[in-house]
């Protein structure tokens, strides 16, 4: 049985156990469902999903969306950033979203491994940011490990793209629609495809190819 339940050690112990699990996720260590406190983690994830579901149900004003996002992230969403529901998110506290961002509808963020979104980032509809992977060993496949995603300033991610664990997308890069991003993307480049491959550099208006 889960130690949080069987010992009845209360909220302080629960927070300590959950902190340990989250730190393991963020540091890339393996996390097993058999670990003490794992049930507490699942409860917290479901609490986040509950808030996200409330936000996603029916029309919400921009002010209401900001209120819900503040609860999900555990910190205020920048006033200059726009999020269009529905947004599907499992855990928001390890997620940071910068200023002037625009996040379109039907995106999915798996945040346990950590997501950092810079300023003025455009994220198209149905984009998936996935920071968690499973142990490839079939005997231990229920165990997971996290790898952070970092999206630098002024990135544009096209519709229906997926960014996989551990990827950094450099300043000003463009991810073509429908791409699967499996490795780091250099600044000021366009990538596209599955897996995403280099297409071209982005030149400023006064520059020539």
Set out the residue ranges of the language-model regions.
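Single conserved hydrophobic/aromatic residue that forms the stacking wall/gate
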Residues: 1-16
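Alpha-helix termination/capping residues and helix-transition junctions
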Residues: 6, 74-75, 182
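Terminal amphipathic alpha-helical/low-complexity segments used for targeting or macromolecular assembly
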Residues: 14-80, 196-200, 204-209
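Flexible, glycine/small-residue-enriched loop-and-beta-strand segment within the central core
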Residues: 87-97, 102-168, 194-209
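A generic "structured core" feature
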Residues: 156, 174-176, 180, 188
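Active-site/ligand-binding-proximal alpha/beta "capping" segment
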Residues: 168, 182-183
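Acidic, glycine-centered active-site loop in nucleotide-sugar glycosyltransferases
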Residues: 186-187, 192-195
């Amino acid at each position: 049985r889960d130690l949080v339940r069987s010992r009845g050690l209360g909220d302080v112990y629960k927070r300590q156990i959950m902190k340990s699990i989250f730190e393991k996720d963020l540091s890339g260590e393996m996390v097993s469902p058999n670990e003490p406190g794992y049930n507490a983690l699942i409860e917290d994830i479901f609490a986040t999903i509950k808030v996200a579901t409330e936000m996603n149900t029916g029309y919400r004003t921009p002010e209401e969306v900001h209120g819900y996002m503040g609860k999900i992230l555990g910190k205020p969403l920048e006033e200059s950033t726009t999020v269009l529901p529905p947004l599907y998110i499992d855990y928001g506290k390890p997620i940071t979203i910068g200023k002037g961002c625009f996040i379109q509808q039907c995106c999915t963020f798996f945040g346990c491994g950590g997501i950092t979104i810079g300023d003025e980032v455009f994220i198209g509809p149905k984009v998936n940011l996935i920071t968690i992977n499973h142990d490839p060993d079939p005997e231990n496949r229920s165990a997971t490990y996290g790898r952070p995603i970092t999206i630098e300033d002024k990135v544009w991610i096209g519709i229906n793209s997926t960014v996989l664990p551990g990827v950094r997308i450099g300043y000003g890069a463009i991810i073509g629609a429908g791409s699967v991003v499996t490795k780091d993307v250099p600044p000021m480049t366009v990538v596209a495809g599955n897996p995403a491959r280099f297409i071209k550099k982005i030149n400023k208006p006064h520059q020539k190819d």
